[in-house]
Amino acid sequence: MKIINPILPIIENILGNLTALQAEGKITTQPIERIALQWYESERNILRKTTNTGREVAFRLLKEGQRLKHDDVVFISDELVIAIEILPSEVIVLSPKTLPEMARACYEIGNKHSPLFLDGDEVTLPYDKPMFEWLQAAGFHPQKAERRLSQALRANSAQGHGHSHSHSHDHHGYHHHGDGNWHKH
């Protein structure tokens, strides 16, 4: 990490998980400042945020596969620890009972270009009313909940970039701008 001024470090690496670093004795009595992120911000390579105490922090995470997760530690000193807090958000939860049902759910949701997340045996995705209603109509028995989204399935996560297919399908006028919030203009 380079410090360009005393209040604006540029974070270039994730140092580890808060619990693991505490268990290793690398974090003891230092105060812990939190940087609150929405789930979709955790995948950005370049980001500027403020900790819960008002300290500005800039991120430049350029290594392939670097994604911020809840309780990631991004700064440690004798005086301070800065850790990530992924904020809970409204989600759709699916609990497929069989592997074919899981495959069908993931395939259908993938065709609608919504990011998918694994949470144990459940599939979660950002809440969107048209998607929720479609999943109900398709017989998937979705539930609405509030959770932290993590462990995105990378093959489906089309966040932040455009893409195309060799086939076409109808999104019935709905689309999103890389944030998972489906809507019509």
Curated annotation (Swiss-Prot):
Q: Which InterPro entries match?
A: UreE (IPR012406), UreE_C_dom (IPR007864), UreE_N (IPR004029), UreE_N_sf (IPR036118)
Any one GO biological process? urea metabolic process
Which SUPFAM superfamilies does the UniProt record give? Urease metallochaperone UreE, C-terminal domain, Urease metallochaperone UreE, N-terminal domain
Q: What is a single cellular component term in the Gene Ontology annotation?
A: cytoplasm
One GO molecular-function entry:
unfolded protein binding
- Quote the Pfam families the UniProt record gives: UreE_C, UreE_N
Q: Which domain of life is it from?
A: Bacteria
List the keywords (alphabetical): Chaperone, Cytoplasm, Nickel, Nickel insertion
Stretches with biased composition (Basic residues): 162-175
> Where are stretches of biased composition, namely Basic and acidic residues?
176-185
Q: Where is this region: Disordered?
A: 153-185
> What family does the entry list?
Belongs to the UreE family.
Its biological purpose is as follows: Involved in urease metallocenter assembly. Binds nickel. Probably functions as a nickel donor during metallocenter assembly.
* Name the UniProt record assigns to this protein: Urease accessory protein UreE
Q: Could you tell me which species this protein originates from?
A: Haemophilus influenzae (strain PittGG)
Q: Which gene encodes it?
A: ureE
